From Swiss-Prot:
Keywords: Cell projection, GTPase activation, Guanine-nucleotide releasing factor, Phosphoprotein
Cellular component GO terms held in the UniProt record: cytosol; microvillus; plasma membrane
Region (Disordered) location: 1-45, 396-415, 420-500
Record's function text: GTPase-activating protein (GAP) specific for RAB27A and RAB35. Does not show GAP activity for RAB2A, RAB3A and RAB4A.
Protein name as annotated: TBC1 domain family member 10A
Species of provenance: Mus musculus
Transmembrane segments: none
Gene Ontology process terms (BP): positive regulation of proteolysis; retrograde transport, endosome to Golgi
Length: 500
């Protein structure tokens, strides 16, 4: 990888030509010019001054390009209801994924509570299972020296990742250190793939929500399951998806498709950073998080939908095309998108309503792959098949996998915990009494049918294959108690979903 190519930006193809994509051509973000200037803000000598800066709810310095203005706050009671429902799902994840996956998808579309977002991403992506299947693997990779040809490139990229965020503002700070560890570990885990610059913002977003080891396994899942081949040497997968996006655009917005065709603008010029960074360097931060919530649940179709929505609203009407008379003006229009179309509520609603399915994407993928093979030959990168979301990843998991062991998240007051512990012996005594009564009936009635015995013992012993309900994890620390006092039950048959 040419280390200086990032500063030069992407090369525009000649009219009618095609762009031979390489991962060195990833465009530099709009804030990269000021990243070098701001990277010294967090030096050790200025650490004391950092506390005086105002930080927004997402961790960005107020007034910086990453920070957002006034946001619509979710009422506290609504947030507590959301947390309670998500805690129930996470603590019974396998059951929910098996029987109520549509409900999980609906709640991901409505937004994961911030306090549980990192944990939910781990469960949705399968990163939690990968971690349990590979205990100590990250530590082993972390202790290894790494390949020198990648280490220097990674180190040069560290200060470019969200330099206005409190985690990454300091050179050599804990955020940059963890980012280096995660990216280095991936080059050792997949030495044939190495490092691509677009992996850095993906890993940085993950580190904002979880520790380094968990972020590493989520990154593995993104690279291998959600976006396989995106970060390979020749960027063949991203080129194919560019053609898929352009073909789908013809159905979603014929006006935008016709304009881009007339201008002979290669899809790689506007969608490379969108797709490879999962819009982490494009959208306002609140929109990024909502898009990622849906992406981890539903897969790459969310990335396609977001791209199509942006193209449709940026170039989808004659009025908007008046200012786009040439290639340069069109590219600038797509690089400086209107804040309205990127606003969280508007964008998410448009993405949910856009009728683009996995089947359409896969059908178009086969068409574009056939064209590629006819004109360019076989793909050099043999990546794994793409998994369309959390359910597909779970279903494709080979053989028996370890049951997810949720960390205790439900907190009960000390009195409630004491009552719960006192109630257990009483319930066990009742069960023993029922078993004794059933045995006595058998002794007195030798002709009692087997069906009658099963019916009589049904209350005492659950049927085969149905496990008794797990006890609620207990923690004597009475913190955040109000989050778990909701009278609603996720296992009940609700007439309508009260999750707002």
């Amino acid at each position: 990888m040419a280390k200086s190519s990032r500063e030069n930006g992407p090369r525009e193809p000649a009219a009618g030509g095609s762009l031979s994509g390489t991962r060195e051509s990833l465009a530099q973000g709009p804030d990269a010019a000021t990243a070098d200037e701001l990277s010294s803000l967090g030096s050790d000598s200025e650490a004391n001054g950092f506390a005086e800066r105002r930080i927004d709810k997402f961790g960005f310095i107020v007034g910086s390009q990453g920070a957002e203005g006034a946001l619509e706050e979710v009422p506290l009671e609504v947030l507590r209801q959301r947390e309670s429902k998500w805690l129930d799902m996470l603590n019974n994840w396998d059951k929910w994924m098996a029987k109520k996956h549509k409900k999980i998808r609906l709640r991901c579309q409505k937004g994961i509570p911030p306090s549980l977002r990192g944990r939910a991403w781990q469960y949705l992506s399968g990163g939690k299972v990968k971690l349990q299947q590979n205990p100590g693997k990250f530590d082993e990779l972390d202790m290894s020296p790494g390949d020198p040809k990648w280490l220097d490139v990674i180190e040069r990229d560290l200060h470019r990742q969200f330099p206005f965020h409190e985690m990454f503002v300091s050179r050599g700070g804990h955020g940059q250190q963890d980012l280096f560890r995660v990216l280095k570990a991936y080059t050792l885990y997949r030495p044939e793939e190495g490092y691509c610059q677009a992996q850095a913002p993906i890993a940085a977003v993950l580190l904002m929500h979880m520790p380094a080891e968990q972020a590493f396994w989520c990154l593995v899942q993104v690279c291998e399951k959600y976006l396989p081949g995106y970060y390979s040497e020749k960027l063949e997968a991203i080129q194919l998806d560019g053609e898929i996006l352009f073909s789908l655009l013809q159905k979603v917005s014929p006006v935008a498709h016709k304009h881009l065709s007339r201008q002979k603008i290669d899809p790689l010029l506007y969608m490379t950073e969108w797709f490879m960074c999962a819009f982490a360097r494009t959208l306002p931060w609140s929109s990024v998080l909502r898009v990622w919530d849906m992406f981890f649940c539903e897969g790459v179709k969310i990335i396609f939908r977001v791209g199509l929505v942006l193209l449709k609203h940026a170039l989808g009407s004659p009025e908007k095309l008046k200012a786009c008379q040439g290639q340069y003006e069109t590219i600038e229009q797509l690089r400086s998108l209107s804040p309205k179309i990127m606003q969280e509520a508007f964008l998410v609603q448009e993405v949910i309503e856009l009728p683009v399915t996995e089947r359409q994407i896969e059908r178009e993928h086969l068409i574009q792959l056939r064209r590629w093979q006819e004109t360019r030959g076989e793909l050099e990168c043999r990546s794994l098949p793409r998994m369309h979301g959390a359910k597909a990843i779970l279903d494709a998991e080979p053989g028996p996998r370890p049951a997810l062991q949720p960390s205790p998240s439900i907190r009960l007051p000390p009195d409630a915990a004491l009552l719960s512990s006192k109630a257990k012996p009483h319930k066990q005594a009742q069960k023993e009494q029922k078993r004794t009564k059933t045995s006595a009936q058998l002794d007195k009635s030798p002709g009692l049918s087997q069906a009658t015995v099963v019916t009589a013992a049904g209350d005492a012993c659950p049927p085969q294959g149905v496990s008794p309900k797990d006890p609620v994890p207990q923690d004597p620390t009475p913190q955040n108690l109000a989050c778990h006092h909701s009278q609603e039950s996720l296992t009940s048959q609700e007439s309508e979903d009260t999750y707002l």
